[in-house]
């Protein structure tokens, strides 16, 4: 409750500890029912929180952070993805919809679905275990550096979320280099690739009314099939 209130600029409720066992539906209803605080107060609180980290932040960087936070404050839980040069499409989910989404068994699965789920993700952040890596999946640096670090620390890949980037890699003739990069990552027989499939590439088992489908594939299976020449197009990869 406290996290989502601060993220959207809403006042944290009194006796916030009493919300510890609240459902995500109850938390969302609270956020939707209150107005955000005044912008100057939010900016002061944001600056104070960032300064406590002890990391030097320039005025330009503060302005960028304020702009990002303002998007969450202004739109609240109705915030949705925007791409450059065009308004959001009607099938883009809102933040509210993502928080309330359930799997096919009716279970909510966001990291805010329960206090335990949130604390697990929070503990990763607290240990600096969430590390952004910016790079080209078919390039020569990002995945190579990750593989080197994993080897040095005796780590093995559990899961790799690739979204729908493989579609673009096929278009740009980068899929083979991407396969080579994946093969360099230390992995096990249980390592998995998670992908999102959109629009016209939807699968027979896609849920009606949804624009995207998530699938899981064993990494060793992916690499073996590629070596056998089974993936010449993106549709081949999706099994269509």
Positions of PLM-derived features:
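Extracytoplasmic/secreted proteins, especially bacterial periplasmic and envelope-associated proteins
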Residues: 26, 41, 141, 145, ...
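Short amphipathic alpha-helical segments and helix-helix/interface helices
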Residues: 122, 147, 179-183
């Amino acid at each position: 409750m406290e996290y989502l209130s601060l993220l959207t600029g809403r006042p944290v409720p009194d006796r916030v500890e009493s919300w510890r066992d609240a459902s995500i539906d109850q938390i969302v209803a609270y956020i939707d029912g209150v107005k955000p605080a005044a912008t100057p107060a939010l900016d002061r609180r944001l600056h104070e929180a960032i300064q406590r980290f002890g990391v030097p932040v320039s005025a330009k960087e503060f302005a960028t952070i304020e702009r990002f936070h303002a998007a969450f404050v202004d739109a609240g839980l109705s915030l949705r993805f925007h791409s450059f040069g065009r308004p959001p499409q009607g099938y883009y989910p809102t933040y509210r919809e993502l928080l309330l989404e359930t799997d096919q068994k009716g279970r909510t699965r966001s990291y805010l679905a329960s206090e335990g789920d949130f604390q697990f993700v929070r503990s990763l952040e607290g240990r600096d275990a969430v590390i952004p890596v910016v790079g080209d999946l078919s390039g020569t640096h990002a995945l190579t550096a990750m593989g080197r670090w994993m080897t040095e620390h005796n780590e093995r890949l559990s899961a790799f979320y690739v979204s729908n980037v493989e579609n673009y890699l096929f278009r740009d003739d980068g899929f083979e280099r991407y396969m080579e990069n994946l093969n360099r990552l230390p992995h096990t027989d249980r390592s998995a690739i998670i992908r999102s499939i959109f629009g016209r590439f939807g699968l027979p088992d896609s849920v009606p009314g949804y624009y995207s489908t998530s699938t899981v594939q064993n990494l060793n299976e992916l690499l073996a099939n590629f070596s056998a020449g089974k993936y010449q197009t993106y549709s081949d990869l999706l099994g269509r």
